[in-house]
């Protein structure tokens, strides 16, 4: 009986270690700048890749520096987006191993998968525009006219190529046969697609003025993506309203359906999760919670960074902080500005 018990623990461990393979590639953010990626055997030196991603690396070496940059952008952008929340995305720094906040099918892992999918396609699309990827250039000029007084020009972000190559790489782990439970694979693939949908929706017309004395008689326009930080904020809104789902039979196969209203299928645009998260008030390394003790809070805010919410009702302590700012700035003809440095004391607050 003891053998079966230990075997059960081992199988459970294997299942959990496979669950988050889809974002292990974020470990690429740790890749040293000194690593040259000009030969296929260099792919073996990259951390966090599954076999199918390793193959993509070997056959698309020219993409790898861009994908490494995408991994760095995911980490930076996630931490920035959640700086005012109890869960502050700091556990993303642990890649390629994670705590349960990103290892299980949580709301937090839903956000990171969506952001990762959006970021890799965004970064590749932008790299095409800047000429950083051989064989990939600006997006084709649209067939329709931009309107009177406007003309197509510039270099549009190559979103189609970004999504094609980005999804091949980021979705590869979830499409492997041995990549965790079917429910988790479906959840992560769904949220990755949500990330790409938000990315597509961020494509907007950008224009530059031309004309005598700045008259802007003609505008040259192209289609460009919003900055990744703006896309992350849209995804954060979806995170806050995410739907909890269950994996149950629907017709001839199992599908993910909303837990509380399982009479309808999951909407393509909604972020979903399988397992509820803790409140992240107290430190619990296993759960990926650093707690909010000594986290800075905003005494006058009504949002998630307010001292009431951030401190989970434990109260807060004030402290005085010295801030150095530019002051007494003067404009000099022509054309520069000089400023002095001024110091002032401000009151800040940290959670008990």
From Swiss-Prot:
What keywords is this UniProt entry annotated with?
Developmental protein, Disulfide bond, Extracellular matrix, Gastrulation, Glycoprotein, Lipoprotein, Secreted, Signal, Sulfation, Wnt signaling pathway
Subcellular localization(s) per the UniProt record: Secreted, Extracellular space, Extracellular matrix
Q: What are the annotated GO cellular component locations?
A: cytoplasm; extracellular region
> Signal peptide position in this chain?
1-22
Consult the record and explain the modifications the protein receives after translation: Glycosylation is required for protein secretion. Palmitoleoylation is required for efficient binding to frizzled receptors. Depalmitoleoylation leads to Wnt signaling pathway inhibition.
Task: Tell me its family.
Answer: Belongs to the Wnt family.
- In this record, residues modified by a lipid of the kind O-palmitoleoyl serine are 213
Q: Which Gene3D superfamilies has this protein been placed in?
A: 3.30.2460.20
| Glycan attachment points | 38, 88, 298, 302
Listed InterPro entries: Wnt, Wnt_C, Wnt_CS
UniProt-recorded name of the protein: Protein Wnt-11
- Residues recorded as bearing Sulfotyrosine in the entry: 273, 280
Other notes on this protein? Xenopus and other lower vertebrates contain duplicated wnt11 genes (wnt11 and wnt11b) resulting from an ancient gene duplication event, but the second copy has since been lost in mammals.
Sum up the protein's function in the record's words.
Ligand for members of the frizzled family of seven transmembrane receptors. Shares much functionality with wnt11b. Signals through a non-canonical Wnt pathway to activate Jun-N-terminal kinase (JNK) to regulate gastrulation movements. Acts in a non-cell-autonomous manner to control neural crest migration, probably acting as an extracellular signal from surrounding tissue, but is not required for neural crest induction. Acts redundantly with wnt11b during pronephros induction. Regulates cardiac morphogenesis through the activation of JNK, but is not required for cardiac differentiation.
Biological process (GO) annotations held by this record are: cell migration involved in gastrulation; dorsal fin development; embryonic viscerocranium morphogenesis; heart looping; heart morphogenesis; intracellular signal transduction; negative regulation of canonical Wnt signaling pathway; neural crest cell migration
Pfam families per UniProt = wnt
Q: Which PANTHER family match?
A: PROTEIN WNT-11, WNT RELATED
Q: Which cysteines are joined by disulfide bonds?
A: 78-89, 128-136, 138-155, 207-221, 209-216, 281-312, 297-307, 311-351, 327-342, 329-339, 334-335
The record's section on CDD domains has:
Wnt_Wnt11
Species: Xenopus tropicalis
Q: What GO terms are given for molecular function?
A: signaling receptor binding
């Amino acid at each position: 009986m003891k053998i079966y018990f230990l075997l059960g623990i081992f199988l459970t461990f294997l299942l959990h270690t496979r669950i988050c393979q889809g974002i292990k590639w974020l470990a690429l953010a740790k890749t040293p700048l000194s690593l040259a990626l000009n030969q296929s055997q260099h792919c073996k030196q990259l951390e966090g890749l599954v076999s199918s991603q390793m193959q993509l690396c070997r056959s698309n070496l020219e993409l790898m520096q861009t994908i490494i940059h995408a991994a760095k952008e995911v980490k930076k952008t996630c931490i920035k987006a959640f700086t005012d929340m109890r869960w502050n995305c700091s556990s993303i720094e642990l890649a390629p191993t994670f705590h349960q906040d990103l290892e299980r099918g949580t709301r937090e892992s839903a956000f990171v998968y969506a952001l990762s999918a959006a970021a890799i396609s965004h970064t590749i699309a932008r790299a095409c525009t800047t000429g950083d990827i051989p064989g990939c250039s600006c997006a084709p000029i649209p067939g329709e006219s931009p309107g009177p007084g406007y003309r197509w020009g510039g270099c549009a972000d190559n979103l189609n190529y970004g999504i094609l190559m980005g999804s091949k790489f980021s979705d590869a782990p979830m499409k492997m046969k041995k990549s965790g439970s079917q429910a988790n694979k479906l959840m992560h693939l769904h949220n990755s697609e949500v990330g790409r949908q938000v990315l597509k929706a961020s494509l907007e017309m950008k224009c530059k003025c031309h004309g005598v004395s700045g008259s802007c008689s003609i505008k040259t326009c192209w289609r460009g993506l919003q900055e990744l930080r703006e896309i992350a904020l849209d995804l954060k809104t979806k995170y806050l309203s995410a739907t909890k789902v269950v994996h149950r039979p629907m017709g001839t196969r199992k599908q993910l359906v909303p837990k509380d209203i399982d009479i309808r299928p999951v909407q393509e645009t909604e972020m979903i999760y399988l397992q509820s998260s803790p409140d992240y008030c107290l430190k619990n390394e296993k759960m990926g919670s650093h707690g909010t003790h000594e986290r800075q809070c905003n005494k006058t805010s009504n949002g998630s960074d307010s001292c009431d919410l951030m401190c989970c009702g434990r109260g807060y302590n004030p402290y005085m902080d010295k801030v150095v700012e530019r002051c007494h700035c003067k404009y000099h003809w022509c054309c520069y500005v000089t400023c002095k440095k001024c110091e002032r004391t401000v009151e800040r607050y940290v959670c008990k």
